[in-house]
């Protein structure tokens, strides 16, 4: 689909706050491609506390105000399930008998098996099914471009915008996520076991109240989790002075 053809439709944009989806909105704004609505799924730890890092939550809220000033409808939708609900799920038929009858706890977010990832996908799917959707695929993401269809398009691909270009596009409007400048390589949940050392140190220094919730997520397991998080010492890092891996 050409740029002129895109202008004949109204598009929904699933926005994450990251540079690719933000650049997509900016380019649509600059080139006059109609935006029906911008959808942001707010992943939630519980009914009131967002799962995103606080600095990211603040950025998202400020960016939403910019989009609304531009005249766009921004729909903020809470995730259809909270992290707390996953934490409190109980094992019933685990291949590890010692876990049955006990809470998922932090293991509900294990690498490759994170149950929260599907929650986000399903929330987005429930909102955008059948809509004309603008996707934040850059022109050099060749492994993704084949997924585009007549109703799922990328303005970046049409304009030849590469991933590296999105940084300057976002900076132009002061809409680049602060995570890039902070050296946080992923826009994930503050309790995610994939969190790198920089992110964990920032959380411990600035948000000890969230670290306490991570302690609770680990302790609620009530079974041996010594094999969990070995790659980046995630569990051990939060309990340097306490041996609770085998609780």
Please name every model-derived segment.
Residues 128-130, 184-187:
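Short gly/pro-enriched beta-turn/loop segments at secondary-structure junctions
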Residues 7-10, 176-178, 185-247:
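ATP/NTP-dependent adenylation/nucleotidyl-transfer catalytic domains that generate, transfer
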Residues 1-173:
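ATP-dependent adenylation/nucleotidyltransferase module used to activate substrates
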